[in-house]
Amino acid sequence: LLGVFMTNRDSAGAAQLNLGLRPKKASLSFCDSASPTSARSLMAIGGKTIPMQNLEWVRTFRPLGALLGRLSPRLLRRIDPGLATLARPVDAFLGRLRGGDLESPAGLKVQEMSIPDFLAHAPRLIAHYAVRPLWSEDELGWLVGLAAQNTRLGAFTIRAIVDHTSATIGCFVYYASPGRTAHVLNILSLPGREVGVLGAMFRHLEDTGHLEARGRAQPALMAGLGLQRWLVFRHRAFAMALTRVPEVNDAIVRGDIYVGGLAGEDWSRLMCDFG
């Protein structure tokens, strides 16, 4: 856990903090919410950026409703409440013009996933990453329990994606908030099935009434995200990793590392309760 400290401009506090963060022989430190100042400090002592994960994707389902939802509460008080009602038919019309850009992938279905099932499947779905969390059932259950307490973004929800044989090929974890934004924490997939998993997820999120969905980019997801219309990327925060292990550094550079969501900081109430 790295906090924010203040020091006099002429003092050596910043340098001492940086030196204290230098990795030990076999340690790995990472952060997925680093500011430019923090990123520069970490790079000065050997830290590396994790490819793509500084980006947040935003997939819009109902453009006018999503735009109104982004307006500040202060501004919304000055807007006729009827605009929110007007947005629905306008978005429906835009949806017809847009056409069927969210067709469900053939043979894939989205199903409810219990926490015990998620605890059983999650390690298998990230096993192909060279650097990944070695979650035990107790550890992952503890994380899920804490994340579920964060209700500011919506209801903590887990869904599985199954193929025509009813085998689980992926799952996604998100804060559900129909009529608002779905905040996606994790998208887990067997290697090579990411495009189908993403397509099924976006179809489900639109069908359940969300205006838009947001989540973190990852190298393995870029092909599937790139196929989506009405999707944009924006810088969110730097994702950084710090280690002295050469093999781990190589994996970081090529993006063969799984961090973020439950394996990161986005679920923490510290990240959203004070915004």
Briefly describe each language-model feature range.
Residues 108-114, 197, 218, 258-261, ...:
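Short, solvent-exposed coil/turn linker segments
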Residues 60, 136, 191, 244-245:
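Intrinsic-disorder/low-complexity, polar/charged segments
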Residues 1-70, 175-239:
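Acyl-donor binding region in acyl/amide transferases
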Residues 48-180:
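Amide-forming acyltransferase catalytic core, primarily the GNAT-like/NAT-type
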Residues 230-275:
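C-terminal functional modules
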Residues 82-94, 212-216, 238-239, 263-275:
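A short, terminal or domain-edge coil/loop segment
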